[in-house]
Amino acid sequence: MYRGSRLAASFLLFLTGSAATAIGFGVAPAAVGGAWPLALLVILFGIAHFVALFGIARGSEWGRQLAITIAEIGGGLSFAGLFAIALSANPFGGPSVANGTGLVAWTLAMYLLLGISAGRVRFDGWQRRSAWWPTPLLRI
């Protein structure tokens, strides 16, 4: 991982990690009520950002892999939120859907940039990502 990519990934991990941790400590416990394991899951997801930030700052491969995994999970959740809003759901419960749409779109963009800067978009193919996929099928 190059120095500029590590710097960009560290900055994006700090931004998204701060937002996820703030949501986990402030918003999720009040929103989920009795479903406290969901709030704990959001808090752990926020803390995982800072663990990946530590790994990337040290230049280790596990930090890059954790940052890629966080980008995939966060991007998937953000895309699911945009899809829910497109289907007329109001996941934030407020009168204005535009604020929620902007927040979810911003989060999706941040996780997309995090995935790119952490090195997921390398076009190495399916074989490198998955060890169980048979090699001869990839040469069709």
Predicted features and spans:
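Topology signature of small-to-medium multi-pass alpha-helical membrane proteins
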Residues: 1-140
